[in-house]
A protein has these predicted regions:
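Flexible, glycine/charged-enriched surface loops at secondary-structure junctions
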Residues: 78-86, 100-109, 145-146, 181-192
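Conserved PLP-binding catalytic core of the aspartate aminotransferase-like
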Residues: 104-137
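Short beta-strand-to-loop capping motifs
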Residues: 23, 119-123, 160
Length: 201
């Protein structure tokens, strides 16, 4: 991998606004020899300042850097393997619990993401109404689908500080919202199924 980048707000759970980037020696050499004519995305300029002064070419967002460092410290304190395990177990619990209340995951089991749980909408369930009811009544936010999946799926984030509390609360809120909208769901089955999975944390 020559270039790898992410967002600070993803599984690291820091505020958004920082994009950590890792660049191989080969990619760095290429970028220095072929700098872009723009100010933005000009990593060659960043390399020069960092290599010579350990500084950035422009004013850095220091509060975000402090928050990012603290988020990394929290991860290291928990232990990376524990962080990975917590994400995996919570994801499994969400998939299993939401399936038990009558929803179906969008992807086949072998293709599913751990960090984003995508589920198909039940027949007749309107995307905006469902998501706004879930947010207004239970303060649980989920995202809709993109492109040809818009209105067909919704996505539940399972990353960062996700915990058994978040899993159980999300399953309960989704089940209650579906019931409010006239769908027959089995919240107790969903919560019991998820609780069994969460014993692995």
């Amino acid at each position: 991998i020559d270039v790898c980048l992410t967002g600070s707000q993803k599984a690291i759970a820091a505020p958004p606004g920082i994009s950590p980037i890792s660049v191989s020696a080969k990619a760095k050499k290429f970028m220095i020899e072929n700098p872009p004519p723009t100010h933005y995305f000009n990593l060659a300029r960043y390399f020069k300042y960092y290599d010579e002064e350990k500084h950035t070419p422009f004013t850095p967002a220091l509060p975000l850097l402090y928050a990012y460092r603290e988020a990394l410290s929290i991860m290291l304190e928990e232990g990376l393997q524990n962080v990975f395990n917590r994400h995996k177990v919570c994801s499994d619990a969400l998939y299993s619990g939401l399936s038990a209340i009558g929803l179906t995951p969008f992807a086949k089991e072998e293709d599913r993401s751990i960090s984003i749980v995508a589920l198909n909408y039940l027949d007749g369930l309107e995307d905006k109404t469902f998501r706004s009811t879930l947010a207004d009544k239970f303060k649980v936010l989920v995202a809709g689908g993109f492109g040809n999946l818009k209105g067909k799926v919704f996505r539940v984030g399972c990353m960062g500080e996700v915990s058994p509390y978040h899993v159980m609360r999300t399953i309960s809120a989704i089940s209650s919202t579906l019931a409010m909208m006239g769908y027959d769901t089995d919240a107790a089955a969903g919560l019991k199924t998820a609780e069994e999975k969460l014993k692995d944390i």
